Amino acid sequence: IIASGFLPEGVMARALITLTEGKSAALQDLGIADVNNGLPATGTCTDGITLICDPEGKKYTDAGSFSLLGSLLSKAAYESVRDCIETYDHPWNASSLLRTPPAQGIDRLRKLSEKS
């Protein structure tokens, strides 16, 4: 992600969280499940985020999901992940074993928490 403004360290950290939330939302909406426990996935072993900002640009003070910058970052992450998975649908994410409806994932999470 390339931001045309300056993000101080705290804002950059929040931007990374907001980007991760957008990515996770896309994975959940697509029904991608964690291969180890069947719960809705929040990432993959191959994903990562690079955030580049302009130290000479406009200074941003917030990148949370309710700020304009955060909303744009979240939307960019969501659409990028969704488009990539829909365009490059490979066997690893096409298997019915890797897809789970959200309710099933919640039930599995409850069962796992009851075992602890």
What are these regions (language model features)?
Residues 1-116:
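A structural signal for small-residue-enriched, beta-sheet-centric alpha/beta enzyme cores
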